[in-house]
Amino acid sequence: MVSYLFVLGALASVAIASPVPELKARASCTFTDAASAIKGKASCTTIVLNNIAVPAGTTLDMTGLKSGTHVSFSGKTTFGYKEWEGPLISFSGSNVVIDGASGHSIDCQGSRWWDSKGGNGGKTKPKFFYAHSLKDSTIRGLHTLNTPVQAFSINGAANLGVYDVSVDNSAGDSAGGHNTDAFDVGSSTGVYISGADVKNQDDCLAVNSGTNITFTGGTCSGGHGLSIGSVGGRKDNVVKSVSITNSKIINSDNGVRIKTVAGATGPVSDITYSGITLSNIAKYGIVIEQDYENGSPTGKPTSGVPISGLTLSKISGSVSSSATPVYILCASCTNWKWSGVSVTGGKKSSKCTGIPSGSGAAC
């Protein structure tokens, strides 16, 4: 169902002979079901999605919104169960604001799909949220629970700000959650993610391609860390000017991670990690490797995706006793600058190779 409130506004002319401007209606709409929201979105510039129960196999399709539209999630948003690829929610448009009202939640109830296989088999699981072709837009304060697999897919976006978003998949730690990436960024420019709070079982952030990407003030727990890549093997394989700062990585497999695809091409350049705190990292505190093939390392780095202009500063914390503090496997790595890097615990690697001389980097 939907309710409309039309607000009429006009500009008055001060000149006696000037014509009266045309009145334009702008609608504020509250939707309580997905079908009405999808059908009525084009008539509204303020949209409230109130306690929406999205039917199984349906995308809550908020694509093609009018410029300047404000969409707010209110109450509890849920989704019916079906094995399909999704997405559960999709947005596109320019100058769009997407936010959550106080006390709202978007609960995917992912345990219905979780089987410890993620996107690698088992049940077909829907991705959660496509932020595709969002331009000059903002996502703020969304509270997301239990995504079946990946949460936010940011692709083809430009000048997108993502503020104070939480992704809580902590229930998946013991219930088979897998491949529950929080933010996957591809083919985008000017993406700014601030204040994210993530509990999941995969990358907190994965930048696969894009320029001018920032992640700052985040907390990442339970997953695979803050990642560049894997880079290579896609249509767009350029990663440039990425800044990851002032964030915490807790109880995760990895901390800082950069991985490129063996035999592929495409540059990774001007990457900064600064002010990163690590705690109880299970596998690698810092891992940089150019040897990924079919999603797994081969131990044989290739040079087709060079990593240049990598700055690490003020990276501190600890790894578990069985973990590796720093692991670097490079075939083409240049112009690095590391300072204030102190990762303690674990066992040092004796297999590092290709570290740029004079960079300050060490295993």
From Swiss-Prot:
Listed Gene3D superfamilies: Single-stranded right-handed beta-helix, Pectin lyase-like
InterPro entries tied to this protein: Glyco_hydro_28, Glycosyl_hydrlase_28, PbH1, Pectin_lyas_fold, Pectin_lyase_fold/virulence
Proregion positions: 18-26
Signal peptide: 1-17
Presence of the UniProt keyword S-adenosyl-L-methionine in the record: no
Key words of the record: Cell wall biogenesis/degradation, Disulfide bond, Glycoprotein, Glycosidase, Hydrolase, Repeat, Secreted, Signal, Zymogen
Enzyme Commission code: 3.2.1.15
GO molecular function, one term: polygalacturonase activity
An individual GO BP term: pectin catabolic process
Glycosylation sites: 212
Subcellular location: Secreted
Gene Ontology cellular-component annotations: extracellular region
PbH1 repeat residues: 188-209, 210-230, 239-260, 268-290
Catalytic activity: (1,4-alpha-D-galacturonosyl)n+m + H2O = (1,4-alpha-D-galacturonosyl)n + (1,4-alpha-D-galacturonosyl)m
Disulfide bridge map: 29-44, 204-220, 330-333, 352-363
Catalytic residues (positions): 202 (proton donor), 224
Similarity comment: family membership: Belongs to the glycosyl hydrolase 28 family.
PANTHER family named among the record's database cross-references: POLYGALACTURONASE (PTHR31884:SF1)
Role of this protein: Involved in maceration and soft-rotting of plant tissue. Hydrolyzes the 1,4-alpha glycosidic bonds of de-esterified pectate in the smooth region of the plant cell wall.
Protein name: Endopolygalacturonase 1
Species this chain originates from: Colletotrichum lindemuthianum (Bean anthracnose fungus)
